[in-house]
Amino acid sequence: MKRALLIVILFSLVVPFAASSRATAANDEATIYRDEYGIPHVYAQTLEAASFAIGYAQAEDRLEELLKNYRKANGTMSEVFGPDYYRSDLIQRMWRHSEISREKYNEVSPKMRACMEAFQDGIKLFMKEHPEQVPKWAQEIHPWDVVALGRYIIWGWPLGEAGGDLQRGGIQPDPAAYRGSNEMLIAPSRTAMNAAIAVIDPHLSWYGEFRFYQVRIYAGDYNVSGVSILGVPFPSLGHSRYCSVAMTTGGPDTSDIFEEELNPANARQYRYDGQWRDMTVRKEKIGVKKGDAVDWREIEIEYTHHGPIVAHKDGKAYSMAISYSKEIGLTDQVHEMMTAKNLDEMKRALARLQLMSQNVMVGTVQGDIYYLRNGRVPIRAKGVDPNKPIPGNTSATEWQGIHPMSDLVQITNPPTGYMHNCNVSPFGMMKDSPLVPEKYVSYIYNATRTATRHQRAEMMTDLLDATNKVTLDQAIDIAFSPQVYHAELWQARLSKVIAITPEVTVTGGVARPGSNSFSTDGGAVMDLIRGWNRRSDAESVGALAFYAFKKSLAPDVA
């Protein structure tokens, strides 16, 4: 019997419609209803017409952010917003997002090209109708900017992995951004309504390119609710009438650093299989705004056949290889995922391997729950350690293709009847997880059994494992639980430290245990923590004190 899939979207509420407008594209009419939160609900006969309306709505809501996202992807931010963006612009030019997206645009399916073009027509119509809202620095936009933006979003994950390889080679890379999220799936066998429950809970910034745009789309067979990136027409997180899609950061290793041996007589040659090869050199001009003027800097970017040179040390050059470097298929894959009618169709879409490294979780109306540790993973040569720079002077260390999805860590309908991923290894997703590192290639699993164990994950496992016949309200309570797991351990440690510290007299002749180790204010903060109920309720002073204490130990500890 077909089951109805219950989706708990933590960032979405269905509410009465409050306003509407109409948009027309290619002789098709679309209607945009806005609920009381301003979220657009788009109704259209065709996906192209819906795309036009979504473009109009995005521009109406956050035009400047949308245009900034395209500038970020194309590496043109610093010419408008100054030198703080120069380094990022250089990285995007290095990877040629705009150029590759333009050159390979016709490889995108005709359906998605039509949608991207209609989407941008909607943006342009709003700009034409409301010139007073168009920033002076607004650039001309092109359909392939959507493709370039997808590449830009993907790149954050493999760049971070490769940065770790550089660091282990003794080179300090640019710091990688920390990204975290929660997700969980509960199988029909453990729910009160005999249907799967999915929770999608991304923890990304309210600022910048990862500030999501929420939308609901009804266009023929396309019926999707979720969030997208500004400048992209369709959601990648959310649900259709058939499947839900959630993601959290984590996954296989999809990038490498190659150590290149340079010719002492010609620094733009590198040794490969006993011969000197010429590097490819590309010139770029990047503008940097200084006051009212723009300083145009001409730079030269060097490439080996592995990828761009990103560092030099001790006469060696270090090139970066990313498995997505020539890929432009993300838009098509996301569309296939959001139109999949069952798990088999979803797996076929995921097998395109266009998504960045993510813990992907899928629920279906048929009652299936599925996990994939997703990524476009290069097949490394035997004996190569991809966690540090790889010798680049021999064909023996070359990538040997891309692992098919069947090689990746995945599970369908686990025996626990639930699973979650809060940025943990697959072993930490459920009690007695069968997804152990010993079963997989190390760089595919890319974690240990205890990797990134933390209170979010342990709390989720314990709460899910203790429940049965879960109701919708119970699932929401689990997702929103204000309990701070294991805070009692910190309270006990603080009490022990204070208890063994000699008493001294404080102002007014009042003795405080351990006050010689704390200022008066510090002692008061410790008292707040020790007397706290270990809940992060909005009004909790103890929770704030605990957070400040943890942040004082290390920026990422809290």
Regions from the PLM with identified roles:
Residues 1-4:
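Positively charged n-region of N-terminal signal peptides that target proteins for export
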Residues 7-16:
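Bacterial N-terminal signal peptides
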Residues 12, 20-21, 228:
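Serine residues within intrinsically disordered or low-complexity segments
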Residues 18-26:
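Boundary at the C-terminal end of the N-terminal hydrophobic targeting segment
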Residues 26-507, 518-522, 531, 535-538:
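Mature extracytoplasmic enzyme cores
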Residues 375-376, 546-550:
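Extended amphipathic alpha-helical segments with heptad-repeat/coiled-coil character used for oligomerization
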Residues 549-558:
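Charged, long alpha-helical assembly modules
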